[in-house]
């Protein structure tokens, strides 16, 4: 579960390293976000000499969470970290690579570009 002030690892090569959630988008009082949700984040750490700087406000989609999510078949999936991929204004990934596994739920939410860039889909 991702909420305001949660820290996320950037799972792409956009230039951000660590993100802090400002707001979970979707609904007027949406408190928690999970895999496939879009969040507004502040960049807390960034790679030098890239477009994204520390303090920038960006949109990102959550691709991994420590909190397990239940699938329709009754199985559960959870990951070792909370991670997100930085998005541009068209909700496409800003980076050209995605690191680590991503959840299959991203395909159902319409993030096909992220699924195709990921090394493995769980």
Curated annotation (Swiss-Prot):
Binds to 23S rRNA. Forms part of two intersubunit bridges in the 70S ribosome. The gene is rplN. Coiled coil: none annotated. InterPro entries: Ribosomal_uL14, Ribosomal_uL14_bac-type, Ribosomal_uL14_CS, Ribosomal_uL14_sf. GO terms for cellular component: cytosolic large ribosomal subunit. Belongs to the universal ribosomal protein uL14 family. GO terms for biological process: translation. HAMAP family: Ribosomal_uL14. This is Large ribosomal subunit protein uL14. It comes from the Bacteria. CDD domains: Ribosomal_uL14. Part of the 50S ribosomal subunit. Forms a cluster with proteins L3 and L19. In the 70S ribosome, L14 and L19 interact and together make contacts with the 16S rRNA in bridges B5 and B8. Gene3D superfamilies: Ribosomal protein L14. Keywords: Ribonucleoprotein, Ribosomal protein, RNA-binding, rRNA-binding. One of its GO terms (molecular function) is structural constituent of ribosome.
């Amino acid at each position: 579960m991702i909420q305001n002030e949660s820290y996320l690892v950037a799972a792409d090569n956009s230039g951000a390293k660590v993100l802090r959630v400002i707001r979970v988008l979707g609904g007027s009082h949406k408190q928690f976000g999970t895999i496939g949700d879009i969040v507004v984040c502040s960049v807390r750490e960034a790679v030098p000499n890239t477009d994204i700087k520390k303090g920038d406000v960006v949109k990102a989609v959550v691709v991994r969470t420590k909190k397990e999510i239940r699938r329709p078949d009754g199985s559960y999936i959870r990951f070792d970290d909370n991670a997100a991929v930085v998005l541009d204004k068209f909700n496409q990934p800003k980076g050209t690579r995605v690191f680590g596994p991503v959840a299959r739920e991203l395909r159902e939410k319409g993030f096909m570009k992220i699924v195709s860039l990921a090394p493995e889909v769980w």
